[in-house]
Amino acid sequence: YIYIVIMTKKLTPFLKPNEVLSETEVDYLKDKSDFKGIALLFHAWFVIGLSVLVYSLFPNIFTFLAAVLVIAGRQLGLAILMHEGAHGLITNNTKLNNHLSQWICAFPVWSDTYGYRHYHLAHHRNTQLEDDPDLSLSKPFPVEKKSMLRKVLRDIFGVSGLVQRYELIFKTVLKSDTKKNDGKKIRGVVSRITLYGILFSNLIILFTWGGLGQWWYWVAVGL
């Protein structure tokens, strides 16, 4: 069953979808389209490539800032599509869904579909409960204005991203604690195999831009 949580001042009991939605609406929400899923992947990378092309043809501060904003948005889009892949929603074929989610969405933005799926499904099972792995993201709020300002500034200046990259690489390599996740060993934040996939996919991006004589574009697309 798919369960829906309606959040009010108090956590209400779980409801089955057919208690709030019609059968037609449930079928519509559950429907998957291979064409739409793959088209969304193509769209994300097409927009990234187009942004780089526009800046290359008209290099100035305005096209640079526009490209940075658009590419950042599509990187977020890839992460969102990885979320869909973690739920098996990109394509009907499970193996194809996992490969596309991992190599086209997750690895280029330094993430991992399998590791994300492992904890994210726990989030759905325990939304806003003590066992919710995402509880730390919402529990501190509301926060004081000074605290909120610090959070915003950390994001604007990339501090949050650098911390995530540090944890991703060094905790993965150095931590020894392991656990099983879909048949894989997970060390630290992600498995070492995942780390290699991230590095490999970003090397592809790096050498693609390098072949066009623009090595530094990887900073915008890869990071």
Where are these regions (language model features)?
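Residues in and immediately flanking transmembrane alpha helices
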Residues: 57, 87, 96-97, 137
